[in-house]
From Swiss-Prot:
Residues noted as binding thiamine diphosphate in the record, renumbered to the chain: 66, 114-116, 156, 185, 261, 437
Residues annotated for substrate binding in this entry: 26, 261, 358, 385, 461, 469, 473, 520
Record PROSITE patterns: TRANSKETOLASE_1, TRANSKETOLASE_2
Binding site for Mg(2+): 155, 185, 187
Cofactor(s) required for function per UniProt: Mg(2+); Ca(2+); Mn(2+); Co(2+)
Gene responsible for this protein: tktA
SUPFAM superfamilies: Thiamin diphosphate-binding fold (THDP-binding), TK C-terminal domain-like
Name under which the protein is recorded: Transketolase 1
Family under the similarity heading: Belongs to the transketolase family.
Self-association state and partner proteins as the record states: Homodimer.
Lineage per the UniProt record: Bacteria, Pseudomonadati, Pseudomonadota, Gammaproteobacteria, Enterobacterales
């Protein structure tokens, strides 16, 4: 039987060989953390390589995602669908082993990591999901939700601001089943970290309310095992295991230096490392007895089978809850949602109201909340402004089975935590802040889109229309930056009806996040036929029209739709054949078939005016170089909103004048 050290050395060998073959990558972290990974994965981790999506598996997150060969080695050795050929194709086009781990590409990878600090944030989200789901579904004698979230993190994660945001919240929420391993090797890309990172990390985490285990020898299996047992015994606090490790462990000339961090060791050094580790096998060769000891297929299947029996007993005792749990873990919509949502939208159209779209959003949450027990909402300390609370909201810090998170002023942390909640399954998270502060959350927003995760992002106070707070709080370029993010769906509704349609779209969307861009100020409701009402979901539609072919088309979104309608009415009265297109979602519109797009924006009509209180440049793709744009080209100013709209040209007279220049 191979020793624990030999089992860990299998990870080291695969990691240095794959990085060498790829001619790029990060061998240092996998080599340094191999002993920790061996103990966690072989002695503690509850998982089934034959079913990577088993609901009650433990979640493992590699927050220091550059060390991706660590997780690929573990998945390969324990029996996941990751053959040796894929390890040989590390970092190559269309392989299952991309440079940083990507969820959806590789069976067993729980989240996409690489931007440092976001993995631990996702892990906090997963731990919140586990704790909340357990409170919602477990019953006396039936613990069907009972698993841990384990995260590996390095010095880079610790330095990133997001780790401060999310680890602080994790302590406050007492996430006892979150266990993080700190790879304390003292090295980052620039060299030894003493020059730029001298925090007392243990005291920092104790101040957050974590259980901290100091001075673990990260290369001694017995010490690591004792620490994990201690952490699992602490149920009311997350645990940080501070593991002293040597980066590039086993490399005679590069261990303990930044040379092993982000580059292949080189053939000569790899040969010396094999010698030092006593690893007698050729590159990519693993002896059968080491495979046999690593193989987790049988044990994993046994664990899942035992859980299946538990779940069958639960289903017998609580059939309704079991059916609901299954539906939610599959991410399926309730069967009656579509019909009830359409009924709500039709009722709104029949009962006009002049309200802010942020208020319309709250009304939609109020209507959809009772239909969607999977909602897990939250705001970055702006609930009274974002209007994200509804009558059924219960904060999880007050009621463990609740459905609302007070994130505090942590926009980046909030968004990345919500990604983790979404990845875990069983919930549909929505988050909120002022649109301006999407800037703080930006990379987690991008990661949601990249990972195709469901999340409804509620962004209010969407333009100069917020008024007196001034340019620090007035978004200009933010909507455009969301629109150009691949796989992000962005909606800027013009009234309560479009707001509800946008919410329905975001809730039903299965393959990515949806951003709702909402006003502070009240917006007039537009009249619509049944056909126009149905066409809102297509992203853009004809709201006002003329007989026959128009000479001129206005395209507008959000608060500027009523301005475009007023300009249209003025020109129509003067005998101009004009049309107004409301375009709440450019991405939804762009997905429509060519015939529909042509029916809304005929190519023959080149006189087009886009009106939006956001950055002007975005609209050239719709108005062409011969069109006109009434938009923002500078930052805003501090003044009452109505004066600002006048100052920046958002008036009927100016819009009409721009239109006439094209005729």
């Amino acid at each position: 039987m191979s020793s624990r050290k030999e089992l860990a050395n299998a990870i080291r060998a695969l990691s240095m060989d794959a990085v060498q073959k790829a001619k790029s990558g990060h061998p240092g972290a996998p080599m340094g953390m191999a002993d920790i990974a061996e103990v966690l994965w072989r002695d503690f981790l509850k998982h089934n390589p034959q079913n990577p999506s088993w609901a009650d598996r433990d979640r493992f997150v590699l927050s220091n995602g550059h060390g991706s060969m660590l997780i690929y080695s573990l998945l390969h050795l324990t029996g996941y669908d990751l053959p040796m050929e894929e390890l040989k194709n590390f970092r190559q086009l269309h392989s299952k082993t991309p440079g940083h781990p990507e969820v959806g590409y590789t069976a067993g990878v729980e989240t996409t990591t690489g931007p440092l600090g976001q993995g631990i944030a996702n892990a906090v989200g997963m731990a919140i999901a586990e704790k909340t789901l357990a409170a919602q579904f477990n019953r006396p004698g039936h613990d069907i939700v009972d698993h841990y979230t384990y995260a590996f993190m390095g010095d880079g994660c610790m330095m990133e601001g997001i780790s401060h945001e999310v680890c602080s919240l994790a302590g406050t929420l007492k996430l006892g089943k979150l266990i993080a391993f700190y790879d304390d090797n003292g090295i980052s890309i620039d060299g030894h970290v003493e020059g730029w990172f001298t925090d007392d990390t243990a005291m920092r985490f104790e101040a957050y309310g974590w259980h901290v285990i100091r001075d673990i020898d990260g290369h001694d299996a017995a010490s690591i095992k004792r620490a994990v047992e201690e952490a699992r015994a602490v149920t009311d606090k997350p645990s940080l295991l501070m593991c002293k490790t040597i980066i590039g462990f086993g490399s005679p000339n590069k261990a303990g230096t930044h040379d092993s961090h982000g580059a292949p060791l080189g053939d000569a050094e790899i040969a010396l490392t094999r010698e030092q580790l006593g690893w007698k096998y050729a590159p990519f060769e693993i002896p059968s007895e080491i495979y046999a000891q690593w193989d987790a297929k049988e044990a994993g299947q046994a664990k899942e089978s035992a859980w299946n029996e538990k779940f069958a007993a639960y289903a017998k005792a609580y059939p309704q809850e079991a059916a609901e749990f299954t539906r939610r873990m599959k991410g399926e919509m309730p069967s009656d949602f579509d019909a009830k949502a359409k009924e709500f939208i039709a009722k709104l159209q029949a009962n006009p109201a002049k309200i802010a779209s942020r208020k319309a959003s709250q009304n939609a949450i109020e209507a959809f909340g009772p239909l969607l027990p999977e909602f897990l909402g939250g705001s970055a300390d702006l609930a009274p402004s974002n209007l994200t609370l509804w009558s059924g909201s219960k904060a999880i810090n007050e009621d463990a089975a609740g459905n609302y998170i007070h994130y505090g002023v942590r926009e980046f942390g909030m968004t990345a935590i919500a990604n983790g909640i979404s990845l875990h399954g069983g919930f549909l998270p929505y988050t909120s802040t002022f649109l301006m502060f999407v800037e703080y959350a930006r990379n987690a927003v991008r990661m949601a889109a990249l990972m195709k995760q469901r999340q409804v992002m509620v962004y209010t106070h969407d333009s100069i229309g917020l008024g007196e707070d001034g340019p620090t709080h007035q978004p200009v370029e933010q909507v455009a930056s969301l629109r150009v993010t691949p796989n992000m769906s962005t909606w800027r509704p013009c009234d309560q009806v479009e707001s509800a349609v946008a919410w329905k779209y975001g809730v039903e969307r299965q393959d990515g996040p949806t951003a709702l861009i909402l006003s502070r100020q009240n917006l007039a409701q537009q009249e619509r036929t049944e056909e126009q009402l149905a066409n809102i979901a297509r992203g853009g539609y004809v709201l006002k029209d003329c007989a026959g072919q128009p000479e001129l088309i206005f395209i507008a979104t959000g608060s500027e739709v009523e301005l475009a309608v007023a300009a249209y009415e003025k020109l129509t009265a003067e005998g101009v054949k004009a049309r107004v297109v409301s375009m709440p979602s450019t991405d939804a519109f762009d997905k429509q078939d060519a015939a529909y797009r042509e029916s809304v924006l005929p190519k023959a009509v080149t006189a087009r005016v886009a009106v939006e209180a956001g950055i002007a440049d975005y609209w050239y793709k719709y108005v062409g170089l011969n069109g006109a744009i009434v938009g923002m080209t500078t930052f805003g100013e501090s003044a009452p909103a109505e004066l600002l709209f006048e100052e920046f040209g958002f008036t009927v007279d100016n819009v009409v004048a721009k239109a006439k220049e094209l005729l």
